[in-house]
Amino acid sequence: MATTADFKNGLVLVIDGQLWTIIGFQHVKPGKGPAFVRTKLKNVLSGKVVDKTYNAGVKVDTATVDRRDTTYLYRDGANFVFMDSQDYEQHPLPESLVGDTARFLLEGMSVQVAFHNGVPLYVELPVTVELEVTHTEPGLQGDRSSAGTKPATLETGAQINVPLFINTGDKLKVDSRDGSYLGRVNV
């Protein structure tokens, strides 16, 4: 059990028998009336996002989630195989569980897998990943008044928009949450 004062991003709540992760929250103390907490919750299994408001100080059920360091090994048909870094046990996870994070998964990458009662829930990538550009068109400078972007294909097959000066073979830092370009990696 936890109270609204314990809310933080990533906390997993049990609501109506389902697991929900807090992805955003705001404590509100209006001039008139009691304080409350607005939360944005994401269903762990379905990915559905809902807004829910709690009165301040309310107790809520929390789930114990074990986040384990793993290494992504390979893809086997519809499954992604991860190896636990402590006991070297391999966990094949279905594509539905890996979700959108699959577009930035590279063999040998260290990621975290969240477990609840021994059942894998979801995969967490590092916030920034370093990937190489495998294909992009040459950028033409000077034909626009502001900085432009162009599409680029990364070594995982994901496509992102990058500045015009990026070339094939460059290694980039990419935000794994939204796929945005963060910068070049100095080699």
Swiss-Prot record:
* Keywords from the named record: Cytoplasm, Elongation factor, Protein biosynthesis
PANTHER family, per the entry: ELONGATION FACTOR P, ELONGATION FACTOR P (EF-P) FAMILY PROTEIN
This chain's function reads: Involved in peptide bond synthesis. Stimulates efficient translation and peptide-bond synthesis on native or reconstituted 70S ribosomes in vitro. Probably functions indirectly by altering the affinity of the ribosome for aminoacyl-tRNA, thus increasing their reactivity as acceptors for peptidyl transferase.
Q: In which pathway does it act?
A: Protein biosynthesis; polypeptide chain elongation
**Primary residence:** cytoplasm
Q: Which cellular components does GO assign to this protein?
A: cytoplasm
Supply the InterPro entries for this chain: Elong-fact-P_C (IPR015365), NA-bd_OB-fold (IPR012340), Rib_uL2_dom2 (IPR014722), Transl_elong_fac_P/YeiP (IPR020599), Transl_elong_KOW-like (IPR013185), Transl_elong_P/YeiP_cen (IPR001059), Transl_elong_P/YeiP_CS (IPR013852), Transl_elongation_fac_P (IPR011768)
Biological source species: Mycobacterium leprae (strain TN)
Q: Name one Pfam family in it.
A: EFP
Single GO MF descriptor: translation elongation factor activity
| Protein name per Swiss-Prot or TrEMBL | Elongation factor P
What is its subcellular localisation?
A: Cytoplasm
Keyword Repeat among UniProt keywords:
no
Might you name a Gene Ontology BP term for this protein? peptide biosynthetic process
Give the UniProt family note.
Answer: Belongs to the elongation factor P family.
What SUPFAM superfamilies has UniProt attached to this entry? Answer: Nucleic acid-binding proteins (SSF50249), Translation proteins SH3-like domain (SSF50104)
